[in-house]
């Protein structure tokens, strides 16, 4: 029977069958060897690419810094027409409170900006609805009719609740008594 060599583990398996290879490939040592192999291959590939770039002149020979084009030396220009993007961080927004431009540093330190006054007369505050005399009489008529229906409903639900309680209570006692006797 032919034997099988695992390239990652450098181990000869007892015989070349699908079940033996499957069991070996599921093993912890084999999985670790496969991971080590591919990380080593990736590191070698990255080192090779760095050496190719260095030899092609992408890196400067003198100090080893990147030779980038001059376009990256300055920040990009702000596009005024593109209003969907937020402004760059170095632009101060218009609603920031600052000292007036004519003040010197000493006066600017003592300058405390005042918050704008808010006019509350146009705003409507939440208030409870006001009732009138006619609506008061309607409310009293409704309130007089409500307790009668509520009492009937309350008595009916109370009796139903008592019936339910007594049924379940007796059933529970019976089942408990059966359990104790048995």
Swiss-Prot record:
Gene3D superfamilies: Classic Zinc Finger (3.30.160.60). Transmembrane segments: none annotated. It is found in: Nucleus. It holds the Pfam family zf-U1. GO terms for cellular component: commitment complex; cytosol; nucleus; U1 snRNP; U2-type prespliceosome. Residues 129-182 are annotated as: Disordered. Residues 130-150 have a biased composition (Low complexity). Keywords: Metal-binding, Nucleus, Ribonucleoprotein, RNA-binding, Zinc, Zinc-finger. Residues 166-182 have a biased composition (Basic residues). A zinc finger (Matrin-type) spans 4-36. GO terms for biological process: mRNA 5'-splice site recognition; spliceosomal snRNP assembly. U1 snRNP is composed of the 7 core Sm proteins smb1, smd1, smd2, smd3, sme1, smf1 and smg1 (Sm proteins B, D1, D2, D3, E, F and G, respectively) that assemble in a heptameric protein ring on the Sm site of the small nuclear RNA to form the core snRNP, and at least 9 U1 snRNP-specific proteins usp101/U1-70K, usp102/U1-A, usp103/U1-C, usp106/LUC7, usp105/PRP39, usp104/PRP40, usp107/U1-H, usp108/U1-J and usp109/U1-L. usp103/U1-C interacts with U1 snRNA and the 5' splice-site region of the pre-mRNA. Component of the spliceosomal U1 snRNP, which is essential for recognition of the pre-mRNA 5' splice-site and the subsequent assembly of the spliceosome. usp103/U1-C is directly involved in initial 5' splice-site recognition for both constitutive and regulated alternative splicing. The interaction with the 5' splice-site seems to precede base-pairing between the pre-mRNA and the U1 snRNA. Stimulates commitment or early (E) complex formation by stabilizing the base pairing of the 5' end of the U1 snRNA and the 5' splice-site region. Belongs to the U1 small nuclear ribonucleoprotein C family. This is U1 small nuclear ribonucleoprotein C. It comes from Schizosaccharomyces pombe (strain 972 / ATCC 24843). The gene is usp103.
